[in-house]
Curated annotation (Swiss-Prot):
Disulfide bonds: none annotated. GO terms for cellular component: cytosol. Binds 4 [4Fe-4S] clusters per heterotetramer. Contains two stable clusters in the N-termini of NBP35 and two labile, bridging clusters between subunits of the NBP35-CFD1 heterotetramer. It comes from Cryptococcus neoformans var. neoformans serotype D (strain JEC21 / ATCC MYA-565). One of its GO terms (molecular function) is ATP binding. ATP binds at G88, K89, G90, G91, V92, G93, K94, S95. Keywords: 4Fe-4S, ATP-binding, Cytoplasm, Iron, Iron-sulfur, Metal-binding, Nucleotide-binding. Component of the cytosolic iron-sulfur (Fe/S) protein assembly (CIA) machinery. Required for maturation of extramitochondrial Fe-S proteins. The NBP35-CFD1 heterotetramer forms a Fe-S scaffold complex, mediating the de novo assembly of an Fe-S cluster and its transfer to target apoproteins. Heterotetramer of 2 NBP35 and 2 CFD1 chains. This is Cytosolic Fe-S cluster assembly factor NBP35. [4Fe-4S] cluster 1 binds at C35, C49, C52, C58. GO terms for biological process: iron-sulfur cluster assembly.
Length: 336
């Protein structure tokens, strides 16, 4: 089954409140691929609008402040820290790092943490957190997230798909509408940290989360890369994106930084940092290297099983790296 541009059908276990719909109808059926949506201030003016039969109608339509922004601001007021996890390229372990970071935060029972998965077309967080069979329910106060732990809430489009193999093929406005609902309609409760897992690159999802969270406050972004120059090159673009939209950069994380033998614990290089890796790039650009997470094959195994690698293998150098990174992030945010 393929999810298309039609309004998204929620599985039957998830009743919706009468006042809410899953996706707003903000894009005409015959709109171009990158339509900004009829409610956008760029409606009828963006480059994507050229040649669209609706261009003049959209350009002349009434524009005003987004009425949902105050609702988002109110909902997010109960979230103390909001952290984006970004990567310039897919396959560097961004979602795996998001899961590890969240497990590490939630290891403190006094800490309330949450994951918002806005990788709309490739949601892997449900699998990584052991929540593939979870469904979302709604109440008068909004959608209830799934819980990996009592103090670790998770929301993902993966919970709304009939099958984990279903493709999501949506234009930008449809994705934006769902992200907005994750922000304003999910009953997150009081959180100390919200970790936002984003798609690779700089896409509609990134622009949406920045736009919607701007007033509520984004505390910063963690950029994940591997040691190779092909990954670092795209991280430079991600850094440029953060600077242009005003997102503070908390620091870099070099993932798959060497290989740790599960038996002898010795570490060896697999992906050689031919240009110095994240450490050299951080020094060049004045961005802190938060840490290096070595490649432990047991990380992949625990991810497939939806288990916390940190709990299962506390003696691993990778676990130590995660805990050090979390400690450094806390120090940076507490100093602000």
């Amino acid at each position: 089954m393929i999810a298309t541009q039609r309004p998204f059908p929620i599985p039957s276990p998830v009743p919706l409140a009468p006042s809410s719909t899953v996706l707003p109808t903000t894009v005409p059926e015959n709109a171009p691929e990158h339509c900004p949506g009829v409610e956008s201030s760029q409606a009828g003016k963006a480059d994507a609008c050229e040649g669209c039969p609706n261009q003049s109608v959209c350009a002349e339509g009434p524009k005003g402040p987004d009425p949902d922004l105050p609702l988002i601001r109110e909902r997010m007021s109960s979230v103390r820290r909001k952290i984006l996890v970004l990567s310039g390229k897919g396959g560097v372990g961004k979602s795996t790092f998001t899961a590890g970071l969240s497990w590490a935060l939630a290891a403190d029972e006094e800490c309330q943490a949450g994951i918002m998965d806005i990788d709309i077309c490739g949601p892997s967080i449900p699998l990584l957190m052991g929540l593939e069979s979870s469904t979302i329910h709604t109440s008068a106060s909004g959608w209830s997230p799934a819980y990996a732990l009592d103090n670790l809430a998770v929301m993902s489009i993966g919970f709304l798909l009939p099958s984990s193999s279903d493709a999501v093929i949506w234009r930008g406005p449809k994705k934006n509408g769902l992200i907005k609902q994750f922000l304003k309609d999910v009953e997150w409760g009081d959180l100390d940290y919200m970790v936002v897992d984003t798609p690779p690159g700089t896409s509609d999802e990134h622009l949406s989360i920045v736009q919607y969270l701007k007033e509520a406050g984004i505390d910063g972004a963690v950029l994940v890369t591997t040691p190779q120059e092909v990954a670092l090159q795209d991280v430079r673009k991600e850094i440029d994106f953060c600077k242009k939209v005003g997102i503070p950069i908390l620091g870099l994380v070099e993932n798959m930084s060497g290989f740790v033998c599960p038996n002898c614990k010795n570490e060896s290089q697999i992906f050689a940092p031919t240009t110095g890796g994240a450490e050299a790039m951080g020094k060049e650009l004045g961005i802190e290297l938060l840490g290096k997470v070595p490649l432990d094959p047991r990380i992949g195994m625990t991810c497939d099983q939806g288990m916390s690698f940190l709990d299962e293998y506390p003696e691993s150098p990778a676990t130590m790296a995660y805990l050090d990174i979390v400690q450094r992030i806390r120090e940076i945010l507490d100093d602000e």
